[in-house]
Amino acid sequence: MKKVSRRALFALALAIVLAAGTLAFCVKYAVNANKWVTFSGSPHVYTGTNLTGGKIYDRTGARILNTTDGRVYSSDAAVRAATVHLLGDRYGYISAPLLGNFAEQMIGYDKITGLSEASKGTASARLTISADVQKAALQALGSYHGTVGVYNYKTGEILCAVTSPSYDPDNIPDIAGDETGDYDGVYLNRFFDAAYTPGSIFKLVTSAAALEADAASKDQTYTCTGETIIGGQEIICMGEHGTLSMTQALAHSCNVYYGELAAALGKDKLQAAADRLGLNGTLRCDGYTARSTVDLSDADEGSVAWAGIGQYTDQVTALQFLRFMGVIAGGGEAAEPYLMQKISRAGQTVYEAKTETTGQLLSAATATTLGGMMRSAVVNQYGAWQFGALT
């Protein structure tokens, strides 16, 4: 009898272990099945390092990539070079997080039916970018290393996200043998992945921080004699601007003014503004993760002054600063940026972007004031004529 009881208990324990294992697998399947199927090493989904998923179009319907059989890029060499940092190359030197992020929709995967949807036709994806705008932006950059980004702050659509230097994926130059420096950092997507010392554009963040904290108005004045000492550190300006208001200081990009303003504001309020505006942390956008850093935790008074001018250890991505510009334009809030507009298969929409907003990051009054200050800088300092129809 005891032997039967022991066997029964053993069988029960085994059944419990089996049930627990099955449950654990089901949970893992529910959570991770899409990742298993779209894993970059899967021969069912990838050819080499490239997703085999369909056709990619720009916002106008111009086809810029066909991945149904290898990789067929645009017939326009300039468009190929202008979009390779978004679409990736054939060898994985330039990755395509955008396509990887939507691999599940592109290949037709479903947790219930698996890859059966893949047999129902090729996926078509429409991006928010304009191939023509990408091409024009890359041509305008010329030999400069950098990025150009344009987005609709009302909808979130990224119209342009181009990186220079670049290359034609159908005619790859001898990058490894280049000794001119022309291709330095060519594999880097400078719009999403590169964080830059922002310099004087950060003065808008300092202005926003001061206005929001009621620490200063746009009429607050400081006197610039070309240099000053703050916290034992010398702050040098490009000229002797005399007594300036905040509006005038932004137009003249006065380092002395903004050093004094940042020091008076203090590191806690400047840090809080950078945090709130999304300039100290990450921003995820359709597979990309942009990272900016404004860390004043160890900053003394002089370092805070330099941080307010966009120096010290400030590092900001183009995407995150562009979003901040959208917040100003949108009266204190803006749409979150995105790249993928729509994915369809066999006449059915399997993904469509929805506009999401940042929430109110600035008061409407502060946003209006900042917009007016920026407009004043264009009209009174740089000249509206230089910006053509944009003004």
Could you describe each region identified by the protein language model?
Residues 1-176, 186, 195, 268-276:
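Periplasmic/cell-envelope proteins involved in peptidoglycan metabolism and beta-lactam response
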Residues 60, 154-199, 205-391:
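Beta-lactam-recognizing serine transpeptidase/beta-lactamase-like catalytic domain environment
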